Design a protein with these regions (language model features):
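Bacterial N-terminal signal peptides
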Residues: 4-14
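Acidic Gly/Asp/Thr-rich repetitive segments characteristic of extracellular carbohydrate-active
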Residues: 15-42
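Extracellular beta-strand-rich solenoid/capping regions of secreted or surface-exposed proteins
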Residues: 40-53, 60-104, 116-123, 172
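Extracellular beta-strand/beta-solenoid scaffold signature
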Residues: 62-70, 90-98, 113-116, 120, ...
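Surface-exposed loop/turn motifs in large extracellular/passenger domains
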Residues: 70-80, 97-107, 120-140, 161-162, ...
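Functionally critical loop-and-helix segments that line ligand-binding/catalytic clefts
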Residues: 130, 155-157, 165, 173, ...
Length: 438
């Protein structure tokens, strides 16, 4: 009797899987299919515009091979589902949800135990809203083997899936006009990956415990608003792109020997505004970047606040706060003189400044010179960092702020802000509003 029961259970499970695909195949365009609580075995392929809506506890579970849900049609919606157990082949781009249809709407789902979470390929108008994506961190006996590295033994294998063998939370390739809002992504390789993807909006997402929170290349005219990138190897790496708006984001607690809050590499004509860049190994890094506007950011409590690489010019810094960074600026000996540190007479706040403001306008009457005397040595000999707060270096900084010392790498802010600048600006705005009301 026990054997018969097992056989009947297997037959019932098989029928359930067939029923799900049959429901999809027999549905009319624009139909809504409601999935009851329980496991609905995948994989499934959607080739017509329909909605799949899950009741609480509804799950589409793959068989550990390939994609779990493949969306080929335009105008498909997946909502309220748990989707799990894709394959693990990076060469095949296995994913919980693989999308090649335009205007897909993926909302309020939980994605787990898969290689890539959501993979979008050559699509436009996708909406990825309020999902939780949990990367696969361990191997199990039931899944297909990961592609073997040359020379790797299969005996006594650690079941941990290291980060570079995981997939990305949301992966976009050659897409346009995506909206990615309110998602939480954790334990993947990279949180959100952009490649050749333009005109998208990424807002209010939380990405933590991944390699790069945002890994971004060759993608233009995208907007990033109010996202949090925390406790990753790097908060965001933005490379080879232009025309971006990065506003109101938090890049925090990204720690490690080579951890960054935000890396800008070969990216031009963009705006970085009102971001919090705090408690990272390196807060903000610029390399070969030109004509960017960096306004109103808080760069605080980093080991290095702002690192300049080579060939960056025409960047404009104003109303930023550099506070409690062990090394506010690192230039590595690069010439940074072609960048501007004050716009229309308004510079940046440096917490090391002696404040002299005789006319009470919130602008320091003395210029700020930020000295970077040991950065080259510090990279080759990290122990040099122990000298950062030594009396000799403090004396050197003090002397450099009073007169330029030839041969030392430094930046000069001609109009540094005092701690009262923002209060004075708020008072002026309030008076202007009252006057306008009259």
């Amino acid at each position: 009797m026990r054997i018969i029961g097992i056989v009947l259970l297997c037959l019932a499970t098989s029928a359930m899987a067939a029923t799900l695909q049959e429901q999809i195949d027999s549905a009319a365009p624009n139909d809504t299919i409601h999935l009851e609580a329980g496991v609905h075995p995948g994989p499934v392929v959607i080739s017509k515009p329909i909605k799949l809506v899950g009741e609480s506890g509804a799950e589409i579970r793959g068989n550990g091979s390939g994609n779990v849900v493949t969306i080929k049609a335009d105008d498909v919606t997946l909502s309220g589902l748990r989707i799990s157990a894709s394959g693990l082949r990076l060469s095949d781009d296995d994913a919980a949800i693989f999308i090649t249809g335009n205007r897909a709407r993926i909302e309020h789902n939980v994605i787990a135990d898969s290689l890539h979470g959501i993979y979008l390929k050559k699509v436009s108008g996708a909406q990825i809203l309020h999902n939780r994506i949990e990367g696969k961190t361990t191997l199990s006996v039931s899944t297909e083997p990961v592609e073997k590295t040359i020379g790797q033994s299969t005996e006594n294998c650690d079941t941990t899936l290291v980060s570079n063998r995981r997939g990305n939370g949301i992966h976009q390739w050659n897409c346009d006009g995506s909206t990615i809002v309110g998602n939480e992504i954790t334990e993947t390789r990279d949180g959100i990956y952009f490649s050749f993807t333009n005109n998208s909006r990424v807002e209010d997402n939380l990405i933590h415990h991944v390699r790069y929170g945002l890994h971004y290349m060759y993608s233009d005219n995208n907007v990033f608003l109010n996202n949090t990138f925390a406790e990753n190897a790097a908060g965001a790496a933005i490379m080879f792109s232009k025309g971006l708006v990065v506003r109101g984001n938090r890049f925090i607690n990204n720690r490690g020997h080579r951890a960054y809050g935000l890396i800008f590499q070969s990216s031009d004509g963009s705006k970085l505004e009102q971001n919090e860049i705090s408690a990272n190994a390196v807060g903000l890094s610029f390399n070969q970047c030109n004509d960017n506007e960096i306004t109103g950011n808080r760069v605080t409590q980093n080991y290095i606040g702002l690192r300049f690489g080579s060939n960056s010019s025409g960047n404009r810094f104003t109303e930023n706060s550099f506070m409690r960074n062990l090394h506010p600026i690192e230039t590595g000996g690069s010439d940074v003189s072609e960048n501007r540190w004050a716009i229309n007479g308004v510079g940046n706040f440096w917490d090391t400044d002696l404040e002299v403001d005789l006319d009470h306008n919130g602008i320091n009457d003395l210029p700020h010179r930020e000295l970077d005397s040991l950065s080259v040595l510090r990279r080759d000999f990290p122990v040099i960092a122990f000298l950062s707060e030594s009396p000799a270096l403090k004396l050197l900084r003090f002397a450099n702020e009073r007169a330029v010392i030839p041969g030392l790498s430094a930046i000069e802010d001609p109009a540094p802000l005092t701690s009262r600048f923002w209060k004075i600006q708020a008072q002026r705005s309030a008076r202007a509003a009252v006057a306008k009301g009259k």
